[in-house]
Amino acid sequence: MCEENENKDSEYIETTPVENGYNSERFKHLWFLCENCETLIYKKSLLEQKGVCAECGATLQMTSSERIELLIDNGTWRSINTKLSSIDVLEKKHTTFDIKMVRKVSILLYKVISGKYFYKEFFKNKYYNKALRILVAYNNTLVNILKVALGSKFIKYLNLDSKETIKILQDIIDTGLKTAQFALFEIRKKIKNEFYRFALLNKAFENKQISSLLAQNLEDRRDDESEIISIEFDRMAFRVQTFLILESLLKLNTQLADVKEQLLSQDKFLKAVATSLVKKELYFPEDKRKTRKIKKIFPFYPGTDPETDYFLWLRTHMAISLMERYLVLKEFKYWFRNRYCGLLEEEFPRFGSDILIEYVKKQDRYESYNMIDHIMQDDLHTSTNSVELFQQINLLFHHKNNEKDCDNNFLSYTENTKGIYFCLLEIMKQFSTLTLDSKDKFPKKKGRDTKDTEDIEDIDEEDIEEEYPLTYDSLTKEEKEYVDANIELIKSTFNLGKEEFIETEEQSYQDYNTSYQKETGLPDAIQTGVGEINGISVALGVMDFQFMGGSMGSVVGEKITRLIQFATENFLPLILVCASGGARMQEGSFSLMQMNKIAAMLHTYQKEKNLLYISVLTSPTTGGVTASFGMLANVTIVEPNAYIAFAGKRVIEQTLNQIVDDEDQISDSLFDFGMFDSMVPRALLKNVLSETIEIYMYGD
């Protein structure tokens, strides 16, 4: 028995390496499958056969590198613009801000401005204009952050648990207004001083000219004539300089005044929201308890997504009623009803803040002298000494740079005021990045509080219907249809009612693009460069269908545009080999823009410079490529049995309700209708291209 076991073990040891050694995946990249006759073709021999199947004669797809090797003379190819690669141009920006950090930075900057720690650098230094521009840009960023907070989070701030958030936002607006007003005061004072300086110096120039003209001796007059010319030149230079300074200051003044107006509107809007909270507390003291009752009625909802949360829709309904009944003036109620009547219930969270802001803009503004008096009051914001203030600037600067050992770096900055000033400017420049919320935008669902569950268990459904008026039964027919549709949407979206929860995560465009880069070894769906075809220099662009279907995105369009520009400057013939599914839908309108851009460059190349452009259409060439540069060539060449179309067969049949034959979009059929200038087999393509170029260049 022992001998038999040993023999089995030895057989297993001997056979295992052989079985593991043969793995078809290891050799897959060396072979190509002909889809027409299902014959495996060795890739090295495929290139020797010019990409044509030896068994059935079908024209097979080739990569861009293989086509370049097929068309260009050995050793003459030189790639250009190889480092261009796609980015996610439609990526949604992270717009969740840490408002506590925003408040911290805004208070810090107000301390600096009001304390006049860097007054010389901001308002007296010869480079003050740069500092003021950064200050104005900071205020614009602050307003935009508040727009995000008071726009997309409008309904959230109407909840009873938003008091702290509203207080933080009020602090931000308050310090922002004070900073803007202080800067406006200094800018306007500087404008006044510039006008005064201009009047004095202009008078001085005039006095110099008069004294020169009053010279009695002829020789003195001749000497003074050159002096007069010099004075006039200096006077003109001074006027130009003053004009540029005033133009810059007036522009900054206008921008800051606009920022101040927006901050005032946001301040009044926030006060309206705070008033709403007070009214809700007075008229609905048990609001929190009632919301738990509503959650018991609708247990089907898994999270708090505002797009599909019926509870939020219900609260919106209630908030609108509250604002109409209790918020502020009768004029506001009448105005609000007229503005709101055209909106659907689900659209109000999107447009509600715009309506309110439009309303408060019509109200009286703060008077400037009241604002200045308010600024001059000594408050908590101005009570920090310079050492503590500089330390806060240093900490924020190193927080921006993700540096942990900022305490060690503090000493070098406290002794150098210029260093602290530099840190402050960097903080203002990177304000939006510094205040981004580092938390996940959509955090995982938190566990329910035990207190909430205890309260809910003690509630009777009959009591709910009696106490809370907005139940399902009290809704109108249209509202019930809306709720039912949302319930089905929620169940289908979150796979509710099924045994297991299936998580589906969509791959981002950036990851999708990176996967193709790793698979093909190309930065994007085209290779461009310069080479020789039978000794003739040409500019060549070859699209690669293996990379995301050869789709035309921003990078493909840019590389083709730069290739055309290069060919125009160097008077080279241009050849574009097309193999594309059309515009890249992941980039939206950015991909469609490439069609116009390329067509405009081709117009200059062909019409103004009278140069030769040849397009070679291979299978498949569809969509935006067919509609743009694919059909704009002086000579259009197509390969046999190639699929050439604008819209696909299925799209045409669904749109026109007509049956489309498979042959109707094949190059052999289209060539009979004169759609192309020539149909050339791949084996003859190189010679045909060189002969066409020779005829065009030396035909006369």
UniProtKB/Swiss-Prot annotation:
<comment type="function">
    <text>Component of the acetyl coenzyme A carboxylase (ACC) complex. Biotin carboxylase (BC) catalyzes the carboxylation of biotin on its carrier protein (BCCP) and then the CO(2) group is transferred by the transcarboxylase to acetyl-CoA to form malonyl-CoA.</text>
</comment>
<feature type="binding site">
    <location>
        <position position="34"/>
    </location>
    <ligand>
        <name>Zn(2+)</name>
    </ligand>
</feature>
<feature type="binding site">
    <location>
        <position position="37"/>
    </location>
    <ligand>
        <name>Zn(2+)</name>
    </ligand>
</feature>
<keyword id="KW-0479">Metal-binding</keyword>
<keyword id="KW-0934">Plastid</keyword>
<keyword id="KW-0150">Chloroplast</keyword>
<keyword id="KW-0275">Fatty acid biosynthesis</keyword>
<dbReference type="Pfam" id="PF01039">
    <property type="entry name" value="Carboxyl_trans"/>
</dbReference>
<feature type="binding site">
    <location>
        <position position="56"/>
    </location>
    <ligand>
        <name>Zn(2+)</name>
    </ligand>
</feature>
<feature type="zinc finger region" description="C4-type">
    <location>
        <begin position="34"/>
        <end position="56"/>
    </location>
</feature>
<keyword id="KW-0862">Zinc</keyword>
<comment type="subunit">
    <text>Acetyl-CoA carboxylase is a heterohexamer composed of biotin carboxyl carrier protein, biotin carboxylase and 2 subunits each of ACCase subunit alpha and ACCase plastid-coded subunit beta (accD).</text>
</comment>
<dbReference type="InterPro" id="IPR000438">
    <property type="entry name" value="Acetyl_CoA_COase_Trfase_b_su"/>
</dbReference>
<dbReference type="GO" id="GO:0003989">
    <property type="term" value="F:acetyl-CoA carboxylase activity"/>
</dbReference>
<keyword id="KW-0444">Lipid biosynthesis</keyword>
<dbReference type="GO" id="GO:0005524">
    <property type="term" value="F:ATP binding"/>
</dbReference>
<dbReference type="GO" id="GO:0009317">
    <property type="term" value="C:acetyl-CoA carboxylase complex"/>
</dbReference>
<dbReference type="GO" id="GO:2001295">
    <property type="term" value="P:malonyl-CoA biosynthetic process"/>
</dbReference>
<dbReference type="GO" id="GO:0009570">
    <property type="term" value="C:chloroplast stroma"/>
</dbReference>
<keyword id="KW-0547">Nucleotide-binding</keyword>
<keyword id="KW-0808">Transferase</keyword>
<dbReference type="InterPro" id="IPR029045">
    <property type="entry name" value="ClpP/crotonase-like_dom_sf"/>
</dbReference>
<feature type="domain" description="CoA carboxyltransferase N-terminal">
    <location>
        <begin position="445"/>
        <end position="700"/>
    </location>
</feature>
<keyword id="KW-0276">Fatty acid metabolism</keyword>
<dbReference type="GO" id="GO:0016743">
    <property type="term" value="F:carboxyl- or carbamoyltransferase activity"/>
</dbReference>
<keyword id="KW-0863">Zinc-finger</keyword>
<dbReference type="GO" id="GO:0008270">
    <property type="term" value="F:zinc ion binding"/>
</dbReference>
<feature type="binding site">
    <location>
        <position position="53"/>
    </location>
    <ligand>
        <name>Zn(2+)</name>
    </ligand>
</feature>
<dbReference type="InterPro" id="IPR034733">
    <property type="entry name" value="AcCoA_carboxyl_beta"/>
</dbReference>
<keyword id="KW-0443">Lipid metabolism</keyword>
<protein>
    <recommendedName>
        <fullName>Acetyl-coenzyme A carboxylase carboxyl transferase subunit beta, chloroplastic</fullName>
        <ecNumber>2.1.3.15</ecNumber>
    </recommendedName>
</protein>
<comment type="similarity">
    <text>Belongs to the AccD/PCCB family.</text>
</comment>
<keyword id="KW-0067">ATP-binding</keyword>
<dbReference type="InterPro" id="IPR011762">
    <property type="entry name" value="COA_CT_N"/>
</dbReference>
<comment type="pathway">
    <text>Lipid metabolism; malonyl-CoA biosynthesis; malonyl-CoA from acetyl-CoA: step 1/1.</text>
</comment>
<dbReference type="GO" id="GO:0006633">
    <property type="term" value="P:fatty acid biosynthetic process"/>
</dbReference>
